[in-house]
Amino acid sequence: MESQQLSNYPHISHGSACASVTSKEVHTNQDPLDVSASKIQEYDKASTKANSQQTTTPASSAVPENPHHASPQPASVPPPQNGPYPQQCMMTQNQANPSGWSFYGHPSMIPYTPYQMSPMYFPPGPQSQFPQYPSSVGTPLSTPSPESGNTFTDSSSADSDMTSTKKYVRPPPMLTSPNDFPNWVKTYIKFLQNSNLGGIIPTVNGKPVRPITDDELTFLYNAFQIFAPSQFLPTWVKDILSVDYTDIMKILSKSIEKMQSDTQEANDIVTLANLQYNGSTPADAFETKVTNIIDRLNNNGIHINNKVACQLIMRGLSGEYKFLRYTRHRHLNMTVAELFLDIHAIYEEQQGSRNSKPNYRRNPSDEKNDSRSYTNTTKPKVIARNPQKTNNSKSKTARAHNVSTSNNSPSTDNDSISKSTTEPIQLNNKHDLHLRPETY
């Protein structure tokens, strides 16, 4: 009879049967409050998890609060979705705390899909499709970038006023050492530029091109927090974050200043290695140039000792300064100041010798007068005349003139002339010399 009634009302009899069977099975002398500590911890964890998911369990007045009593479990409600992005990828309030940086130790906790633009630059909607990517985020700097052929699928939601490149943007690698931060921040800046955020990057004067919005600042902070773990940050970055843990713009500004300083250091090293001096410029200017370079390098942590500095300076000396390489090469403890004392001594000696030379500059008017009366005497022609050939070189007119005069002269003169050729010539001098015609 009782079984017939149960068969007529299967849903009621099933519940009654379950309740009766359950009550018989749990009917023991054990105190329901006597529960082990491990089970209490499990209950606490379950309740905490339920509170975090913001799910409520409806209270049932029909079922007593007995942990051993079987009661129907409520259906699990899936967490709400925020557009195309999964809920587990969104940052919570606890994770926004700086102490929660450890939650982002793995790339899968990134608050946006890897290799894509910031979520704020894509219109939300069910049409957007974001493919899954392998766990290659956080790879070293040498890892090749994704292939350029990987692009988003075309969608009707792409026609929007918002900016979209429809290309995967590779995020920066994971920072693994404080010494790698200068190289890492370069990839981080490149990542921001590829994400259409180049306008908010500080310029040389430390100010961005355009103001930054709150959403963009949140994106900067999240990306920096994920890929730059706090234990691998340099000391100066930790000092900035200790004042304001969201001041990523100040970190970028300081990083750009350090990049420019590194460029200046490289230029100073190249200049110091290629020094040249031959006395054409003042020694004071050369000394000031070299000492300023050495001081800048020492202040930036690149120490140049006296031995290395002297070798670099002496290698660039030429001319009269070249011998300093050989006179000073045995002095191991020579300083840069001592080397420049020798350079100054040679330079002053050169200047003194140039000033002591006489200056023979003539008046231009004198040069003009001399040019008028000057004859060409560069190579005067010296002619040696032979007396025997002199008489033979007379012209015919001179000979004819002599003949005519001899015919017109009296005979007495001719006789005296003929006699003078045979008689010796008497010289009235103290030596009493006689010249004969044959010896003349």
From Swiss-Prot:
Residues 299-401 are annotated as: RNA-binding. Pfam families: TYA (PF01021). The gene is TY1A-BR. Residues 1-93, 126-173, 352-440 are annotated as: Disordered. Homotrimer. GO terms for biological process: viral translational frameshifting. Residues 153-165, 402-418 have a biased composition (Low complexity). Capsid protein (CA) is the structural component of the virus-like particle (VLP), forming the shell that encapsulates the retrotransposons dimeric RNA genome. The particles are assembled from trimer-clustered units and there are holes in the capsid shells that allow for the diffusion of macromolecules. CA also has nucleocapsid-like chaperone activity, promoting primer tRNA(i)-Met annealing to the multipartite primer-binding site (PBS), dimerization of Ty1 RNA and initiation of reverse transcription. Keywords: Cytoplasm, Phosphoprotein, RNA-binding, Transposable element. It comes from the Eukaryota. Retrotransposons are mobile genetic entities that are able to replicate via an RNA intermediate and a reverse transcription step. In contrast to retroviruses, retrotransposons are non-infectious, lack an envelope and remain intracellular. Ty1 retrotransposons belong to the copia elements (pseudoviridae). It is found in: Cytoplasm. One of its GO terms (molecular function) is RNA binding. This is Transposon Ty1-BR Gag polyprotein. InterPro entries: TYA. The C-terminal RNA-binding region of CA is sufficient for all its nucleocapsid-like chaperone activities. Residues 429-440 have a biased composition (Basic and acidic residues). Induction: Ty1-BR is a weakly expressed element. Induced under amino acid starvation conditions by GCN4.
